[in-house]
Design a protein with these regions (language model features):
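N-terminal catalytic or cofactor-binding beta/alpha core of small enzyme domains
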Residues: 1-114, 120-123, 132-143, 152-173
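Short, solvent-exposed loop/turn segments at secondary-structure junctions
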Residues: 128-129
Length: 173
């Protein structure tokens, strides 16, 4: 059983550096040997290619992702590959300097990959301005995300959606 935790984001765009900061903090933690933490930064295409032939049982992506929640909200979403009908057209718009998790998953599908189970630990950004620091509310959410990721790693494997829901509920306490 292997778990890959990936920090995604651009440290030059304020809160977009959230995933990178979480990965850096996780790299200082004493995690089980089967867990690998990698800062992918803006190398979304590299991440997609690494996940195409993934030998990981679980990948946890950590990224700032806009969902319309209050800034600093941390959430966990299970990501799925798009349906084949959704990838029959042209390849998704690619930006070699950064890709949202859904675009990474779309590229994996276009390439015919099977990434295994993929979770997104996301945080609602407050500001994506050109600066090299997180906003105070997102900075405060980094510790929450670290706790969520370590909790997910500690409770894995969870085979069913119900077990994942229970793991997430226990983290909320």
């Amino acid at each position: 059983m292997t778990v890959l935790v990936v920090g995604v984001g651009n440290i030059f765009l304020g809160d977009d550096g959230f995933g990178v900061e979480v990965a850096h903090r996780l790299s200082t933690k004493d995690l089980p040997d089967h867990v690998r933490v990698v800062d992918y930064g803006i190398r979304g295409m590299h991440l997609a290619y690494d996940l195409v032939g993934a030998d990981h049982d679980l990948t946890i992506m950590v990224d700032a992702t806009q969902r319309g929640d209050p800034p600093g909200t941390v959430y966990v979403i299970e990501l799925d590959l798009p349906e084949p009908a959704d990838t029959g057209g042209p390849a998704p718009l690619l930006d070699a300097h950064g890709m949202q998790p859904d675009v990474v998953m779309g590229l994996i599908a276009v390439l015919g990959g099977e990434p295994g189970r993929v979770l997104l630990v996301g945080c609602e950004p407050a500001s994506l301005d050109h600066r090299m620091s997180l906003s105070p509310v997102v900075e405060a959410a980094v510790d929450t995300a670290v706790r969520v990721v370590t909790g997910l790693v500690g409770s894995y494997p969870f085979g069913t959606d119900e077990e994942l829901t229970c793991a997430l509920a226990s983290l909320a306490k």
